[in-house]
UniProtKB/Swiss-Prot annotation:
<dbReference type="InterPro" id="IPR036736">
    <property type="entry name" value="ACP-like_sf"/>
</dbReference>
<dbReference type="GO" id="GO:0000035">
    <property type="term" value="F:acyl binding"/>
</dbReference>
<keyword id="KW-0443">Lipid metabolism</keyword>
<dbReference type="Pfam" id="PF00550">
    <property type="entry name" value="PP-binding"/>
</dbReference>
<keyword id="KW-0444">Lipid biosynthesis</keyword>
<keyword id="KW-0934">Plastid</keyword>
<feature type="modified residue" description="O-(pantetheine 4'-phosphoryl)serine">
    <location>
        <position position="37"/>
    </location>
</feature>
<comment type="pathway">
    <text>Lipid metabolism; fatty acid biosynthesis.</text>
</comment>
<dbReference type="GO" id="GO:0000036">
    <property type="term" value="F:acyl carrier activity"/>
</dbReference>
<dbReference type="GO" id="GO:0009507">
    <property type="term" value="C:chloroplast"/>
</dbReference>
<comment type="similarity">
    <text>Belongs to the acyl carrier protein (ACP) family.</text>
</comment>
<keyword id="KW-0597">Phosphoprotein</keyword>
<dbReference type="InterPro" id="IPR009081">
    <property type="entry name" value="PP-bd_ACP"/>
</dbReference>
<feature type="domain" description="Carrier">
    <location>
        <begin position="2"/>
        <end position="76"/>
    </location>
</feature>
<keyword id="KW-0276">Fatty acid metabolism</keyword>
<dbReference type="InterPro" id="IPR003231">
    <property type="entry name" value="ACP"/>
</dbReference>
<keyword id="KW-0596">Phosphopantetheine</keyword>
Amino acid sequence: MKDNFTRLQSIVGKQLGIDPSKVKLESDFGRELGADSLDVVELVMAIEDEFEVNIEDQSASQIATVQDVLNYLERN
């Protein structure tokens, strides 16, 4: 089974239409990966589906990087 980072690379790549290999731990969804606010909402929904979690709005608003997502997944 893929590790969480590899799964996230795939999700982000698919949602944003970019090469998953360009998605790094420190990648900022908005500044570096070009995601707008709608993209971020769709990313959160895709992450929730893939990892079977519910990311509350307050938590989602604090997620800016791939590492932030991984940290959230580890805590929940």
